[in-house]
Amino acid sequence: MPRRGPVPKRDVLPDPIYNSKLVTRLINKIMIDGKKGKAQKILYTAFDIIRERTGKDPMEVFEQALKNVMPVLEVRARRVGGANYQVPVEVRPDRRVTLGLRWLVQYARLRGERTMEERLANEIMDAANNTGAAVKKREDTHKMAEANKAFAHYRW
């Protein structure tokens, strides 16, 4: 850890079309090898697909999807007397958003549709409807935390 104190969080600029920092963060998660233009094109096309299929504002659908994917609890490994325990802890608000975005992109990449735009659009729409792999990941994370509730007193 640095001795100079905590490293400040760097703030991202809001994206040009939706004027949202969340959208910029999602673009950065989609981006591979620094190709931001391509990542933007993927996201904006996915948003167009969402608008076309649902008839709703894609930002509303995306925000609902993110809300449904963000975890409240997670488990962290804690070593006590030679044994590793999975200790349930609450997730910090900034980490909730990060994990939600990460899982949306991760499970969109694993889908079977032809293009990344379609995969991302479908994953976001599924998450907004409380279905899909990203929501399942959140449920599994919560189940793990629930199952290890007995070790909650090891929290730090």
UniProtKB/Swiss-Prot annotation:
One MF term in the entry's GO annotations: tRNA binding
CDD domains: uS7_Bacteria (cd14869)
Coiled coil region boundaries: none
Pfam families reported in the protein's UniProt record: Ribosomal_S7
Keyword Transport: no
Any Gene Ontology biological process: translation
Keywords tagged on the record: Ribonucleoprotein, Ribosomal protein, RNA-binding, rRNA-binding, tRNA-binding
Keyword Ribosomal protein: yes
GO cellular component: small ribosomal subunit
Family to which this protein belongs: Belongs to the universal ribosomal protein uS7 family.
NCBIfam families in the record: rpsG_bact (TIGR01029)
Purpose: One of the primary rRNA binding proteins, it binds directly to 16S rRNA where it nucleates assembly of the head domain of the 30S subunit. Is located at the subunit interface close to the decoding center, probably blocks exit of the E-site tRNA.
Subunit field text: Part of the 30S ribosomal subunit. Contacts proteins S9 and S11.
Protein name from the UniProt record: Small ribosomal subunit protein uS7
Gene, per the UniProt record: rpsG
